[in-house]
Every structure is written in structure tokens, then in C-alpha cells.
């Protein structure tokens, strides 16, 4: 089995390439942009649903916090080395 992928360095490089100031460690919108994924509210609601979010999607602030944690957790579960402070 190969070593874990360093998610932080890949995302930092993606942010640099993107040219925008993206705070992927704290913002789901910025994380999705760094991954070159749709970061619209509709897309985030769909992603939250796919990942098992059971809260109110009209409360986007709460959903975004949950979604950020869920995406980071998925990256970690799928072989990504994620900074420890980003995991619960």
C-alpha cells in the first residue's frame, strides 16, 4: 500500500495556481474551489445530502461547517493525509 497523499500541500498548490486567496482549511466554499468543484449553494446542498447531512439545509452556515468537516474526513478516509487540527 502506498503512503498517504499530502492533502494540505496539494490544496495549497491548487490555491496558488487558482490565484485567489482561498482559506480551504476553514471554508467549504474555498475548499471546493481549491478542488475545482462547484461551490454554489445548490451544489453544497446536494453534496451535504450525499454525505448524510440531516440538518436544515436552509441554515447554510451550520450546513457549511458540517460539510467542511465531512469533506475533510472523507479525504482522510480515502488515503489523504490531513492536518490533525482539521479532524475532530
Cite the ranges covered by each PLM segment.
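Amphipathic alpha-helical interaction segments
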Residues: 1-88
Amino acid at each position: 500500500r502506498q503512503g498517504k497523499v499530502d492533502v494540505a500541500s496539494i490544496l495549497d498548490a491548487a490555491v496558488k495556481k487558482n490565484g485567489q486567496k482561498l482559506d480551504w482549511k476553514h471554508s467549504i466554499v474555498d475548499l471546493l474551489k481549491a478542488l475545482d468543484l462547484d461551490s454554489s449553494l445548490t451544489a453544497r446542498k446536494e453534496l451535504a445530502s450525499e454525505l448524510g447531512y440531516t440538518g436544515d439545509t436552509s441554515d447554510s452556515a451550520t450546513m457549511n461547517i458540517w460539510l467542511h468537516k465531512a469533506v475533510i474526513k472523507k479525504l482522510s478516509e480515502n488515503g489523504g493525509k490531513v492536518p490533525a487540527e482539521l479532524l475532530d
